[in-house]
């Protein structure tokens, strides 16, 4: 039931104070001709409605949220208070630069810290998400080669284990995407070598990759890429594994995008809010989006790079997210960020060892911050799919891992526990998953019809994709909901 369904005419949650200024009639042309369609509810109705929704929801503040490649770590509440300081909360982006010096200083110093962490020379903070950062990076790649009149470079090479946004971002800029095979979970260097030629603009990589494995041949990959005149692009989705240990810039990457909402602990989920800064080496600095923040003497200024790709976001990006990330980095410090990566890798390896007793883990040895298990054998013997396992996990009050990704692992479960989970939490999660796998063999129908205890049972995903309901349409019967759309 929506808040609109609880509306009763004349019911109010507030009283408007008496007017203390003269009445001024509003011109008819500015007046609404129809009543504003807002719910009429009391304050208890509002509080109870949203409290009920919160109780039905799941978040990292409720329990472990081990979505692979999402880094759903606990977010310190101090960062929220920092972002809510009046000096940050009450500014307007159209104020004169002279009155925004505190905000500009924060952005300038955040850029410097992120450049130090990644080994880049400059950075834009404008992109609003990881995929937005990828798009920005690909626009920089295109502008770089266009500026050099090297117009035949139309290809971008992407591993078969890459995030789906990698080929999507390259395609949006007009590049042809070529898939590179994996060998033992890592880039097949020989296959890469075959595809590198003077038509390749960039190679996009994640390191550690989406299997949680560190690309040991990264220096060779960088050498081959640069020898053919192409750029090496770093998808920073998995930076949480290597902070303080190795810098993407030292591996040979020319462009980096980060996810502040993942690695640097700003709350995210359900589409935002996010931030996807893009860092570049010196030869690409002139192509960054504008405005860029620079320091001139004692003042901070908004500047336009010489060969800029233009704006990619209004104003300064998602500024409150930048404040939270800045607060997090200062709070953790250099040693703290290194400890974050150490604990993320330790937790992933601990959980991997426990889960490997009852699920196949395709790639042996140590993983980095995440790992991928496969329920292929479970499916062959019981008919229970990874999706069924994920749905059943919900009945135990915890969130399932990412499923069916990366695509090169059949019936994949991609698990990233992050550094903020305790040993006890990891033990409980492994016990739950083991119990679910045991149920798959003893009573597979329990899993095939799961979840059984959640407010919303298994949805009809085919119908949801063919007749989606994107927004509220007014009061209508439950039986008519699937007929509503946008």
Curated annotation (Swiss-Prot):
Its cofactor is pyridoxal 5'-phosphate. The modification N6-(pyridoxal phosphate)lysine is found at residue 262. Keywords: Oxidoreductase, Pyridoxal phosphate. It holds the Pfam family GcvP2_C. GO terms for cellular component: cytosol; glycine cleavage complex. Its EC number is 1.4.4.2. GO terms for biological process: glycine decarboxylation via glycine cleavage system. InterPro entries: GcvPB (IPR023012), GDC-P_C (IPR049316), GDC-P_N (IPR049315), GDC_P (IPR020581), PyrdxlP-dep_Trfase (IPR015424), PyrdxlP-dep_Trfase_major (IPR015421), PyrdxlP-dep_Trfase_small (IPR015422). It catalyses: N(6)-[(R)-lipoyl]-L-lysyl-[glycine-cleavage complex H protein] + glycine + H(+) = N(6)-[(R)-S(8)-aminomethyldihydrolipoyl]-L-lysyl-[glycine-cleavage complex H protein] + CO2. One of its GO terms (molecular function) is glycine binding. It is an enzyme of class 1 (oxidoreductase). It comes from the Bacteria. The glycine cleavage system catalyzes the degradation of glycine. The P protein binds the alpha-amino group of glycine through its pyridoxal phosphate cofactor; CO(2) is released and the remaining methylamine moiety is then transferred to the lipoamide cofactor of the H protein. Belongs to the GcvP family. C-terminal subunit subfamily. PANTHER family: GLYCINE DEHYDROGENASE (DECARBOXYLATING), MITOCHONDRIAL (PTHR11773:SF1), GLYCINE DEHYDROGENASE, DECARBOXYLATING (PTHR11773). The glycine cleavage system is composed of four proteins: P, T, L and H. In this organism, the P 'protein' is a heterodimer of two subunits. This is Probable glycine dehydrogenase (decarboxylating) subunit 2.
């Amino acid at each position: 039931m929506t808040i609109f369904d609880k509306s009763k005419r004349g019911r109010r949650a507030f009283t408007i104070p008496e007017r203390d200024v003269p009445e001024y009639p509003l011109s008819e042309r500015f007046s609404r001709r129809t009543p504003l369609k807002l719910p009429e509810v009391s304050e208890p109705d509002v509080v109870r409605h949203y409290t009920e929704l919160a109780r039905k929801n799941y978040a990292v503040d409720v329990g472990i949220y081990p979505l692979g490649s999402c880094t759903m770590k606990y977010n310190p509440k101090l960062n929220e208070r920092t972002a809510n300081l009046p000096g940050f909360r009450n500014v307007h982006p159209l104020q004169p630069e002279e009155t925004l010096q505190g905000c500009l200083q924060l952005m300038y110093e955040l850029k410097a810290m992120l450049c130090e962490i990644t080994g880049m020379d400059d950075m834009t903070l404008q992109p609003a998400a990881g995929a937005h950062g990828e798009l920005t990076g690909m626009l920089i790649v295109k502008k770089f080669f266009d500026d050099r009149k090297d117009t035949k470079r139309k290809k971008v090479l992407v591993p078969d284990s890459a995030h789906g946004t990698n080929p999507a971002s390259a395609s949006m800029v007009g590049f042809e995407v070529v898939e590179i095979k994996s060998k033992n979970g890592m880039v097949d260097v020989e296959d890469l070598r075959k595809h590198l030629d003077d038509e390749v603009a960039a190679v996009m990589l994640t390191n550690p990759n989406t299997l949680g494995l560190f690309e040991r041949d990264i220096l060779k990959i960088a050498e081959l890429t640069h020898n053919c005149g192409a750029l090496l692009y770093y998808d920073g989705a998995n930076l949480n594994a290597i902070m303080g240990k190795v810098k993407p810039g030292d591996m040979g990457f020319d462009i980096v995008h980060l996810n502040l909402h993942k690695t640097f602990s700003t709350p995210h989920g359900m589409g935002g809010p996010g931030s996807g800064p893009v860092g570049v080496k010196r030869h690409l600095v002139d192509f960054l989006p504008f405005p860029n923040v620079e320091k001139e003497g004692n003042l901070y200024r908004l500047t336009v790079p010489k060969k800029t790709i233009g704006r990619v976001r209004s104003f300064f990006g998602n500024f409150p997210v930048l404040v939270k990330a800045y607060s997090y980095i200062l709070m953790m410090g250099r040693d703290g960020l290194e400890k974050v990566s150490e604990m993320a890798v330790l937790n992933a390896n601990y959980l991997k060892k426990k889960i490997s007793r009852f699920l196949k883990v395709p790639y042996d040895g140590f993983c980095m911050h995440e790992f991928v298990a496969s329920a292929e054998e479970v499916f062959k013997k019981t008919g229970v799919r990874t999706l069924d396992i994920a749905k059943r996990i919900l009945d135990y009050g915890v969130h399932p891992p990412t499923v069916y990704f990366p695509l090169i692992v059949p019936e994949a479960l991609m698990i990233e526990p992050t550094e903020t989970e305790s040993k006890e939490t990891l033990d409980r999660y492994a016990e739950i998953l083991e119990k679910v796998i045991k149920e798959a063999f003893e009573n597979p129908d329990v899993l095939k019809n799961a979840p059984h205890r959640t407010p919303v049972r298994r949805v009809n995903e085919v119908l949801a994709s063919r007749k989606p309901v994107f927004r509220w349409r007014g009061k209508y019967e439950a039986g008519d909901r699937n007929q509503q759309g946008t």
